């Protein structure tokens, strides 16, 4: 399984540039199995949303590339930018 950290901290795998500090340093985790199944886990104070519904903190929620995933309603996950080979990327909302 690959685990991708998402947040405003520069050490995250997917970095969200957020000058308002609404995005947490480590906002969420995206887990991807070797079979391509994915879950997202909210680790923030301001929430992670899947298809407009706030998910419970620290509970893995199944997602697909067709789902809309947003962070504190200020940034959306661009599925085309999810790392495919484990490299860190920069993601600007």
Language model regions located:
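C-terminal boundary/linker segments immediately following FHA domains
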Residues: 2-7, 15-17, 29, 34-37, ...
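Short coil-to-beta-strand transition motifs
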Residues: 21-25
């Amino acid at each position: 399984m690959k685990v991708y950290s998402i947040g405003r901290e520069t050490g995250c795998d997917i970095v969200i540039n957020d000058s308002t500090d609404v995005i947490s340093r480590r906002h969420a985790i995206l887990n991807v199995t070797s079979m391509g199944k994915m879950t997202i886990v909210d680790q923030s104070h301001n929430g992670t949303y899947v298809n407009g519904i706030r998910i419970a903190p620290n509970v893995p929620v199944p997602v697909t590339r067709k789902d809309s995933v947003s962070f504190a309603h200020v940034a959306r996950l661009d599925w085309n930018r999810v790392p495919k080979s484990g490299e860190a990327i920069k993601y600007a909302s």
